[in-house]
Regions:
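Conserved short histidine dyad/triad with adjacent acidic residue
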Residues: 34-50
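A short hydrophobic beta-strand segment most commonly corresponding to one strand
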Residues: 81, 95-112
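Glycine- and acidic-residue-biased ligand/ion/polar-headgroup-sensing regions
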Residues: 53-54, 58-63
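A short, N-terminal "cap"/entry segment at the start of jelly-roll beta-barrel domains
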Residues: 1-31, 115-135
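Short beta-strand His + acidic residue motifs that chelate non-heme Fe in jelly-roll/DSBH
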Residues: 46-47, 65-66, 82, 88-94
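A generic "binding-loop/recognition-motif" signal
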Residues: 51, 70, 86-87, 96, ...
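Short acidic-glycine-tyrosine-enriched beta hairpin
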Residues: 69-84
Length: 135
């Protein structure tokens, strides 16, 4: 069992940015898909859904979660669970970074329903390319 150290902690490169840092996925040889999301204040993750369940563990910050049922605020320590194919969007409504871990039981097959909002950027990292496995 390898232990991968220093997997978390990337930050957006621009003020209106966010980071998607892949921690486990098929490139790691895992069936599950796990990534760290880091979202700058004011940034909105566009409407999308996944073919699998998504579980989000919020480590830092606070935001707004939107679904067809409405909007609800969330903060550090909360867990958000989306069943398969539930359309959702997340917004950092606070003044600090949101840091959250997203878990999927398999390839999420994400379907994005709209483009990035003007001025927003996404930095994507695959930790398998830079993390050091410890045997």
């Amino acid at each position: 069992m390898p232990i991968l150290r220093g997997m978390l902690g990337k930050v957006p490169s621009r003020p209106k940015g966010r980071v998607r840092n892949f921690i486990a996925n098929k490139e790691f040889g895992t069936q599950s898909d796990i990534h760290e999301n880091v979202i700058s204040p004011g940034v909105i993750i566009p409407w999308h859904f996944h073919e699998t369940e998504e579980v989000i563990v919020v480590l830092e910050g606070n935001g707004e979660c939107r679904t067809d049922e409405g909007a609800e605020n969330y903060s550090a320590g909360d867990v958000i669970i989306f069943p398969p194919r539930v359309k959702h969007s997340l917004k950092n409504s606070g003044d600090t970074l949101i840091r959250q871990i997203c878990f999927f039981p398999s390839d999420p097959a994400t379907k994005v329903l709209e483009g990035e909002y003007p001025g927003q950027t996404v930095d994507v990292f695959n930790a398998s390319e830079w993390a050091k496995p410890i045997p």
